[in-house]
Amino acid sequence: YIENGDITVKASGTEGKNTVSQGNKKDVEDTNTIITGTSNENTVTIDTSKGNVDVTFDDLNIDASSRKEAAMSVTGSGNTTIKLDGDNHLTGGNGSSGIDSIGSLTISGGENDSLTAKGGSGADGSGGDGIHSGSLTIYGGTVNANGGNCGDGNYSDGGSGIRISSHSLTIYDGTVNAKGGNGGDGNYSDGGSGIRSNGSLAISGGTVNATGGKSGGG
């Protein structure tokens, strides 16, 4: 349960196994990692430096506004697979992403499963991205990704709904709604992109709605 403290999930180096840490429980071996519950202060960290990590989000609700960091952070070059079960909500803190991953991320779910990832609004800077990842693959479920609104700083923009920093965004099935955050009142403040990719974009199925945020008044 996320309300019991920050959760860290690491690839154990053995296929199909993770090690999970929370509070006084350190590196507990687990073959079916399910994260559930509600918290306004605790976050999830996933470490794929030793291999791939599979987790299930079961009606998970995290609002990291008080922490000023991503609700879920992923380190390492391995792949993280998130299986959705029920309705899940991840909100990043000030200027931070809902989900921030430097490696590859895979999201899957059924028709009635969903993930809403929101970037935090920037106080005097840019808003956070809903989902920021090196690469992202979506196999099903409903994924709502909303960029955070920009603050009042100059040259600051709204966050992207989905931002791919290096590789690819691939959508096979499901419904994806991506909306950029709005620009602020500072000079040269633009709205964020619904989807922003520095790599390739491939859509072979499902429904995709991408909307950019409004530009600011400066």
PLM regions: where:
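A composition-driven surface/loop motif
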Residues: 1-218
